[in-house]
């Protein structure tokens, strides 16, 4: 049975990222220096917590019951519950969408910042997050290995 309550403590994550790890060195790299400061992680974690509590976790039941459905025939498709779209749009609008797929894009978040966000999201709704990861993995395979014709 899917859980419907999300409890999480961000204090330890903030400590590990800001005090224990040498994040100043990381965010001084060319890929991040024009986009992030060390205190930006607080906002990302706080927003992620609220989205996990208020949006992802309540959608967790839909992820399990009825869950996704495969539609066969001439058009192969996977149909997701209606709540998936709202969750995905909310997460992306907050700037917390998948960060793994195209690491060459400017403004991407350091993965050491995204990992605890993904951990929170996974705790709030494992099925939804695994669906995203599967999709991101397929996208990465296509980006790195497919012909230009298929990419278009």
Descriptions of predicted regions:
Residues 1-133, 149:
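Amphipathic, small/basic residue-rich leader segments at the start of a protein or domain
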Residues 47, 137-140:
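Hydrophobic alpha-helical transmembrane segments of multi-pass small-molecule transporters/permeases
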Residues 139-140, 144-152:
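Phosphate/diphosphate-binding loops
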């Amino acid at each position: 049975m899917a859980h419907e309550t999300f409890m999480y403590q961000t204090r330890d994550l903030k400590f590990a990222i800001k005090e224990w790890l040498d994040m100043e060195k990381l965010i001084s790299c060319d890929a991040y220096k024009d986009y992030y400061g060390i205190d930006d992680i607080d906002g990302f974690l706080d927003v992620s917590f609220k989205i996990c509590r208020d949006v992802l976790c309540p959608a967790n039941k839909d992820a399990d019951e009825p869950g996704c459905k495969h539609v066969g025939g001439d058009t192969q498709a996977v149909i997701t519950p209606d709540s998936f779209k709202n969750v995905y749009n909310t997460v992306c609008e907050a700037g917390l969408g998948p960060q793994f797929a195209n690491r060459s894009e400017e403004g991407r978040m350091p993965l050491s910042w995204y990992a605890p966000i993904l951990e929170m999201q996974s705790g709030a709704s494992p099925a939804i997050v695994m669906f995203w990861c599967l999709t991101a993995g397929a996208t990465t395979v296509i980006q790195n290995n497919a012909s230009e014709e298929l990419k278009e």
